[in-house]
Each structure stands twice: as C-alpha cells, then as structure tokens.
C-alpha cells in the first residue's frame, strides 16, 4: 500500500488543528476522531505517544461511491493519522486511495479514487508548505 506522509515543524496540537483546517478547505467532513493515546491508556494502562486518527470523508465522493458500489465504497474513507514520534517529530499520513482501489475493475470507483487522491494530495499540501524529513524513531 502507498501512503502520503509528511513531517511538519509544529507541535502535535498545532498539526491536528492545521490538518482539520486543511481537510475543511477541501470539503472533507470528519466523521470520527480516535485518540489512540487515550484509548490505550484507559483500556490497556499503556502510556503511549500522541497518536490521533481522523476518519474523514468527502461526502459528495462518498455518495457517488455508494451509488456505484455499496460495498467497495467503504474503501474510500480517509483515515488520517497524526502522530508524534519518540524523537519529537510530528508526522501526518493518509493512505493513497488509488492504492486500495487500483486492483478493482470498476470504472466509476477508479474515477472516484483518482478524484479523492487529488483532494487528499491537496489537503496534505495545504497543511504545511515545506515538509521536513521524517524518520520515525
């Protein structure tokens, strides 16, 4: 699978805010927000680094996808991960939607995936103009 990923020179909290703003500018709706640090702490008593998952969706594209194929459409949701690595670097990543749909022989879904890829790249570019080298540690 292929991911779009970048490290940014801002705090985790600022990266979360910048990501949400960039998603909004590209007309994505945030359907769910999962604070993995909190979930792991409360359910497993594990102290984990800041790690947030945003379940984002372009509603017009989701509607088209559901109309085209009600099962395959589930593959087009964007799971945006914002995490702070142990070295302090903050990374934002999302699965490239064309990597999940590329093997499916469904013309409309492939078209939707390419449109979603374009919107995904745009919101990633909008977050921070100059990404930093990102090396998890």
Describe the function of each predicted region.
Residues 9-11, 57, 83, 95:
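Solvent-exposed residues in well-ordered beta-strands and their adjoining turns
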Residues 1-2, 24, 46-49, 85:
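Short glycine-enriched loop/turn motifs at secondary-structure junctions
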Residues 103-137:
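Well-ordered alpha/beta subsegment
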Residues 1-26, 125, 133, 137:
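Terminal, regulation- and interaction-focused segments at domain boundaries
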Residues 29-32, 130:
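Short, structured loop/turn "capping" segments at alpha-beta junctions
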Residues 20, 37-38, 121:
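Short glycine-/small-residue-rich flexible loop motifs, especially phosphate/cofactor-binding loops
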Residues 29, 36-39, 43-81:
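Compact, glycine-rich, soluble single-domain proteins
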Residues 79-106:
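Beta-strand/loop substructures that line and gate deep hydrophobic ligand-binding cavities in soluble
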């Amino acid at each position: 699978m292929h991911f779009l990923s970048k490290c940014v020179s801002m705090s985790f909290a600022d990266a979360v805010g910048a990501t949400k703003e960039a998603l909004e500018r590209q007309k994505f709706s945030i359907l769910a927000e999962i604070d993995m640090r909190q979930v792991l702490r409360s359910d497993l008593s594990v102290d984990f680094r800041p790690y947030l998952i945003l379940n984002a969706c372009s509603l017009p594209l989701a509607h088209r996808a559901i109309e085209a194929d009600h099962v395959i459409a589930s593959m087009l949701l964007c799971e945006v991960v914002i995490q702070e690595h142990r070295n302090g670097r903050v990374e934002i990543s999302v699965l490239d939607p064309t990597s999940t749909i590329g093997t499916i022989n469904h013309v409309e879904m492939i078209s939707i995936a390419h449109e979603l890829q374009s919107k995904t790249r745009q919101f990633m570019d909008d977050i921070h103009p100059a990404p930093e080298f990102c090396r998890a540690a």
